[in-house]
Structures are given as C-alpha cells and as structure tokens.
A protein has these predicted regions:
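Short beta-rich binding modules
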Residues: 1-168
Length: 168
C-alpha cells in the first residue's frame, strides 16, 4: 500500500475545550515505550485511556473521542493514580492493590466521568488534551456508547487478540 500524499491525509476535528461528560471505551496497555523527559531517555510501561464525549458530535455525527497516555505507575505522585482517584471519588487503599477485591482496570470500560479538555496549538494543528478527570455529578446521565469497547492488557493470560484486531 502506498502512503497518502500529505494533502490527502485529511484534517482531524479537535474536541472542543471545556468540561464534558466522558464514557471510557478503550483501555490500551501499550507495553514498554521509549520516553524522553528533560533530555533523559527512559523506557516505561505506558497505557492509554480513551473516552467518548457522547454529547459532543463531530461534523459527521459521531461523538468526539479524547485520549490520555499514562505511565503504568500507582506511585502517590503519579498522574494515573490522581486521575483514577478523582474519577472514582475516593483514595486507593492497600486493599485496592491486592487480594480478591483488588481494583481491576477492566472495570473502567463503560464508566462515565467528567473530563476537562483543553486545546493546544502546535505547528498549525490543534490538539485536544484531557487535563483532568473527575467523578460524574449525581443525577447526570451519560449518553450511550456508540463505538465498540476495547480492553487490551499485556499481562500474562489476559491478552485478547480479537480486541487487538479491533484497533484502527
């Protein structure tokens, strides 16, 4: 397959800035990725969480989606831990990390939340960024998921090839 010409790639619509209802529809374990921070190169396990914005539609009628990459770390200062605690509305305890009632990230799929979306313009392109994740307010009903849900874990015994094949 030939690569498209740069003018044929099409511009992506950016999700509008503001506070939105989001529904998690993808959790992707990306494995170990090469990252650079302050000039230092490291290899870190990364994940991506994706949300649909059911009340915000693109020009083709489909809902916008937004994504956030995280280091796979639950250290007290990690962004993943902060966002998950804000999303669920309570801090993690040791029981959430071990034992039969340990928190399973698969529970995130289909879960609604409040998202703060900001926009960043770089090189003439506008990018939408998830700046914060919060618990859905009482009484607020999220829209229905209109895209297939995908959960991919690279943990031993959890990889789902069919889910992987659904990525586009």
């Amino acid at each position: 397959m030939k690569l498209p010409k740069p003018s044929e790639g099409g511009a992506m619509e950016s999700a509008p800035a503001g506070t939105h209802i989001g529904v998690c529809y993808r959790f992707i374990d990306m494995g170990t990725q090469k990252t650079e921070f302050k000039g230092e190169i490291k290899h870190k396990r990364m994940i991506t969480i994706s949300w649909l914005l059911p009340d915000e539609l693109m020009s083709d009628g489909r809902p916008f989606s937004v994504h956030k990459r995280y280091s796979w770390s639950m250290h007290e200062k990690s962004t993943l831990r902060k966002d998950l605690q804000d999303w669920r509305g309570k801090a993690f305890s040791m029981e959430d990390f071990e034992g039969p009632n340990a928190f399973n990230t698969k529970k995130l799929i289909g879960q609604p939340c409040m998202l703060s979306v900001t926009q960043d313009v770089r090189d003439g392109n506008t990018y939408s960024n998830v700046s914060s994740v919060g618990k859905l307010m009482k009484g607020v009903k999220p829209g229905a998921l209109t895209e297939p849900t995908i959960y991919i874990s690279l943990e031993k015994g959890e990889f789902d090839k069919d889910a992987f094949d659904m990525l586009r």
